[in-house]
């Protein structure tokens, strides 16, 4: 039931235009034409006819597709397969056509191609009808959706009538058979709208030859009369939209060496961008500035080796001096030309006018005008005086107001300064209060922390010798050094006494030894002389006494003994030790004094 309803709707939507189709066939029959054709009007070529019956059908079953490549625009018939998809169109003009997928031409359901004469061995072009009549533009519009035929694989089923986009006329004699075999399919118009997709950017068109609307008269009035305006006729022999060459074996796939139109368009766009970039770089490249007024640029050779310029232009210098500027002569007075004739006559006094009658009105006017002018001047002076008075009053008011404003500004400034000063004082009070509270807290913390620390510190300092007895320190500093000095003096005096005693004892012993030796020598000399004393005997005691005196003098000299030699370095070391102890005691005393002062300050602060 649903299938029959869909068939009925499809039959109702399909237009019944069989008489129009017959009229179209009759118009498509080849006949001589005398009217000029518009460019693009004859954009269909009929393929060779296999039979007389196929001439009317194969003449308008063709669609021309415009493709633009590097060489220009070309048109090829588009072959539609059984699946209804558009194959890829070749870019060349003369290329063989690929046969259908099943190897047969014409209608697969009715056999119209082979039996009915729609497409034989010589008529291989089978295209889907188009629905866009008119002339082809210079470039195909990529945004126009392609117009495809119905879902039936036969391209002879429907064709668009001229001037209609939605009217399809069945052209196959067995179109009903296809309708039955296709099942519940929508009409060709709805199928055309469904199959149209923006992704397939192929522009298709078709147009019938028609006579141009000629406004000229058929015959000229005068043989020598020139036409008012030239008439441009279109020659289809040079029209790019007309296919050239063999159309019997067009291929649906491009040749291996044929470039892709999309790739060609992309290369052209890249070439345009590169050219535009190069032009921009040329414009941005630094060039020689233009010459100043009165000069011009001259080409100069910059090669390594100079060459003679044969075609040198002969230049000639010429001079021209103008006269000095002269003063402008005075402009003559303008004297207008006379327009009448001069006539002389004699006029006596009192003949032309009465003085009293003529002068009195003029005098009244002059006097009245003078009085009026004087009154105006007086009024103006009064007005100026009033303006000055009002201006003076305004200035006084303004000065008073300015003084008041200054007073108020000064008062505001004083208030602001007082406010800032009060804020500063309050901030200082708050700051001092915070500082005092922090000090009190720190003091309390220090007291609690030092409560147990001070005794231990004092004990350790006392144990280390930093706290000492003043009496003991006075004894160590004042008494002990004096005692040591006195002891040293006493010991030194005793050492000196001992040394003197030793020297005296030595001297006495030496004298006695000398006397003893002299006595023995005297006894030895007396014995050989038989006890006779001579002059030698009398002189020897003198010699002995001299030697004795020398020995005594030598014995009287203080000789350094071992004790004196040992006592000298001992005394130096002792003095150095005593001085170091004194310095240490002085430093300890200073430290103790500082600690006492700090403790007193803390007690006062508490």
From Swiss-Prot:
User: What are the subcellular locations of this protein?
Assistant: Cytoplasm, Cytoskeleton, Cilium axoneme; Cytoplasm, Cytoskeleton, Flagellum axoneme
Q: Where is the composition biased (Polar residues)?
A: 547-556
According to the UniProt entry, which residue ranges have a biased composition of type Basic and acidic residues? Answer: 15-46, 573-606
Is Disulfide bond found in the keyword set? no
Identify the Pfam families for this entry.
Radial_spoke_3
Domain of life assignment: Eukaryota
Q: Which residues carry this modification: Phosphothreonine?
A: 331
S-S bonds:
none
Alphabetized UniProt keyword annotations = Cell projection, Cilium, Coiled coil, Cytoplasm, Cytoskeleton, Flagellum, Phosphoprotein
The record's listing under InterPro entries reads: Radial_spoke_3
Provide the residue span(s) of the region labelled Disordered.
Answer: 1-103, 520-606
Keyword field contains Cytoplasm: yes
Question: Single GO cellular component annotation?
Answer: cilium
Q: Where does this protein chiefly localize?
A: cytoplasm
- Which ranges form a coiled coil? 393-429, 572-604
How does this chain assemble?
Component of the axonemal radial spoke 1 (RS1) and 2 (RS2) complexes, at least composed of spoke head proteins RSPH1, RSPH3, RSPH9 and the cilia-specific component RSPH4A or sperm-specific component RSPH6A, spoke stalk proteins RSPH14, DNAJB13, DYDC1, ROPN1L and NME5, and the RS1 complex-specific anchor protein IQUB. Interacts with IQUB. Interacts with phosphorylated MAPK1. Interacts with MEK1. Interacts with PKA regulatory subunits PRKAR1A and PRKAR1B. Interacts with RSPH1. Interacts with RSPH4A. Interacts with RSPH6A. Interacts with RSPH9. Interacts with LRRC23.
Protein family according to the UniProt entry: Belongs to the flagellar radial spoke RSP3 family.
Give the protein's biological function. Answer: Functions as part of axonemal radial spoke complexes that play an important part in the motility of sperm and cilia. Functions as a protein kinase A-anchoring protein that scaffolds the cAMP-dependent protein kinase holoenzyme. May serve as a point of convergence for MAPK and PKA signaling in cilia.
PANTHER family under this entry?
A: FLAGELLAR RADIAL SPOKE PROTEIN 3, RADIAL SPOKE HEAD PROTEIN 3 HOMOLOG
Protein name listed in UniProt:
Radial spoke head protein 3 homolog
Organism field: Bos taurus
List the top taxonomic levels of the source.
Answer: Eukaryota, Metazoa, Chordata, Craniata, Vertebrata
């Amino acid at each position: 039931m649903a299938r029959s309803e869909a068939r009925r709707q499809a039959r109702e939507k399909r237009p019944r235009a069989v008489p129009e189709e017959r009229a179209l066939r009759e118009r498509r029959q080849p006949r001589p034409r005398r009217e000029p054709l518009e460019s693009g009007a004859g954009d269909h070529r009929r393929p060779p006819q296999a039979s007389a019956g196929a001439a009317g059908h194969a003449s308008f079953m063709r669609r021309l597709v415009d493709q633009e490549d590097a060489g220009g625009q070309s048109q090829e018939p588009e072959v539609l397969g059984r699946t209804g998809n558009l194959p890829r169109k070749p870019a060349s003009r003369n290329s063989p056509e690929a046969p259908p997928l099943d190897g047969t031409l014409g209608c697969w359901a009715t056999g119209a191609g082979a039996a009915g004469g729609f497409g034989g061995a010589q008529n291989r072009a089978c295209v889907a009808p188009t629905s866009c009549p008119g002339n082809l533009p210079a470039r195909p519009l990529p945004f126009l959706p392609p117009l495809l035929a119905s879902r039936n694989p036969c391209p002879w089923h429907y064709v668009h009538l001229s001037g209609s986009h939605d009217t399809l006329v069945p052209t196959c004699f067995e179109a009903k058979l296809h309708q039955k075999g296709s099942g519940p399919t929508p009409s060709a118009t709805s199928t055309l709208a469904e199959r149209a997709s923006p992704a397939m950017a192929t522009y298709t068109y078709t147009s019938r030859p028609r006579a141009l609307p000629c406004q000229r008269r058929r015959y000229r009035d005068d043989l020598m009369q020139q036409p008012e305006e030239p008439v441009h006729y279109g020659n289809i022999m040079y029209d790019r939209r007309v296919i050239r060459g063999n159309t019997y074996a067009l291929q649906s796939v491009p040749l291996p060496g044929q470039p892709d139109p999309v790739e060609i368009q992309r290369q052209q766009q890249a070439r345009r961008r590169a050219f535009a970039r190069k032009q921009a770089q040329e414009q941005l490249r630094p060039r020689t500035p233009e010459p100043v007024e009165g000069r011009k640029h001259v080409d100069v050779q910059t090669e390594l080796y100079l060459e003679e310029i044969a075609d040198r232009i002969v230049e000639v210098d010429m001079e021209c001096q103008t006269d000095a500027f002269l003063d402008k002569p005075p402009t003559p007075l303008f004297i207008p030309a006379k327009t009448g004739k001069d006539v002389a006559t004699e006029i006596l006094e009192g003949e032309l006018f009465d003085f009293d009658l003529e002068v009195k009105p003029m005098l009244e006017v002059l006097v009245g005008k003078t009085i009026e002018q004087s009154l105006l001047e007086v009024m103006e002076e009064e007005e100026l005086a009033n303006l000055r008075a009002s201006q003076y009053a305004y200035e006084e008011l303004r000065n008073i107001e300015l003084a008041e404003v200054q007073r108020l500004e000064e008062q505001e400034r004083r208030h602001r300064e007082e406010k800032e000063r009060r804020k500063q004082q309050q901030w200082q009070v708050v700051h001092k209060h915070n500082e005092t509270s922090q000090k009190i807290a720190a003091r309390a913390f220090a007291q609690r922390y030092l409560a147990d620390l001070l005794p231990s510190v004092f004990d350790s300092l006392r144990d280390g010798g930093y706290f000492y007895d003043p009496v003991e320190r006075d004894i160590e500093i004042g008494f002990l050094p004096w005692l040591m000095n006195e002891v040293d003096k006493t010991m030194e005096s005793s050492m000196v006494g001992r040394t003197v005693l030793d020297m005296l004892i030595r001297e006495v012993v030496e004298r006695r030894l000398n006397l003893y030796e002299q006595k023995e020598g005297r006894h030895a000399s007396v014995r050989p002389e038989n006890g006779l004393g001579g002059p030698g005997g009398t002189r020897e005691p003198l010699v002995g006494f001299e030697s004795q005196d020398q020995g005594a003098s030598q014995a009287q000299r203080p000789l350094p003994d071992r004790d004196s030699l040992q006592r000298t370095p001992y005394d130096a070391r002792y003095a150095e030790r005593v001085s170091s102890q004194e310095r240490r005691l002085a430093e300890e005393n200073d430290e103790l004094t500082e600690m006492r002062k700090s403790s007193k300050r803390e007690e006062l602060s508490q």
